[in-house]
C-alpha cells in the first residue's frame, strides 16, 4: 500500500508587522480539527496558552461553549500583535495516521527563505517542540547544536540575524502543566518585546 503524502492544509499566517514567528510541525488529521487554522485540535493547549499569556484567561480564544477555538478571533489577535504562524513541514507522510511527531515522515520542509522574505521585520522564531526545532535547524546553512527546551540561540539566515527559542510542546502528550507551559511562552514573548499579562 502506497503511503499518502499530505500537504499542509492551511497556508502560513504572516501578518506584515510580524516580529515573532511560531513554528510547529504539521496539523492533525481533519477529524481532529476544531477549526481551519493552525493548532486546530481542541485537545492541544496552544490557544489556551495564548489566552493565559496575553489575557490571563485560558478560555479567551474558545468559541463560546463549543469544543472549538475561534479562528477569526485568533487571526485578529495575531495580526494586531505581529505574530506569524507557520509549520516547519510543507509535505509529510503520517506513518501511523495520527498527529504524533514521532511518526511524521517529512517529505518536504517549509520553504523558509520564501516565508522569511514575506515578513522582513521578523527577528524571533519560537519552535513548539523538539521535532519542529530539528526540522528548522536542518534548513540552516551552518550546523547548529539543538537547543534544550527553553533555550534561545542566535543564528543567521540569508544575511539576517535571528533568534531561535525552543519552547515546550503544547500537546497534551508533553508532560508539563498548562501553567508551566504558559510561563515558558510568556517569558519568550516578553523577551521578544511583546506586551503580556
Please describe what each predicted stretch is:
Residues 80-139:
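Internal catalytic-core helix/loop-beta-alpha segment
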Amino acid at each position: 500500500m502506497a503511503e499518502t503524502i499530505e500537504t499542509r492544509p492551511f497556508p502560513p499566517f504572516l501578518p506584515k508587522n510580524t516580529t515573532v514567528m511560531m513554528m510547529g510541525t504539521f496539523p492533525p488529521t481533519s477529524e481532529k480539527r476544531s477549526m481551519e487554522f493552525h493548532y486546530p485540535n481542541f485537545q492541544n493547549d496552544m490557544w489556551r496558552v495564548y489566552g493565559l499569556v496575553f489575557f490571563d484567561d485560558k478560555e479567551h480564544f474558545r468559541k463560546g461553549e463549543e469544543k472549538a477555538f475561534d479562528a477569526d478571533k485568533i487571526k485578529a489577535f495575531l495580526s494586531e500583535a505581529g505574530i506569524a504562524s507557520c509549520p516547519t513541514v510543507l509535505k509529510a507522510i503520517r506513518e501511523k495516521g495520527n498527529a504524533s511527531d514521532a511518526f511524521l515522515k517529512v517529505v518536504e520542509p517549509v520553504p523558509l527563505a520564501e516565508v522569511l522574505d514575506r515578513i522582513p521585520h521578523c527577528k524571533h522564531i519560537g519552535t513548539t517542540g523538539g521535532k519542529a526545532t530539528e526540522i528548522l535547524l536542518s534548513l540552516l546553512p551552518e550546523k547548529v547544536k539543538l537547543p534544550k527546551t527553553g533555550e534561545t540561540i542566535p543564528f543567521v539566515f540569508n544575511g539576517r540575524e535571528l533568534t531561535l527559542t525552543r519552547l515546550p510542546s503544547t500537546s497534551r502528550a508533553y508532560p508539563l502543566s498548562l501553567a508551566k507551559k504558559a510561563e515558558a511562552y510568556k517569558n519568550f514573548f516578553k523577551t521578544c518585546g511583546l506586551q503580556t499579562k
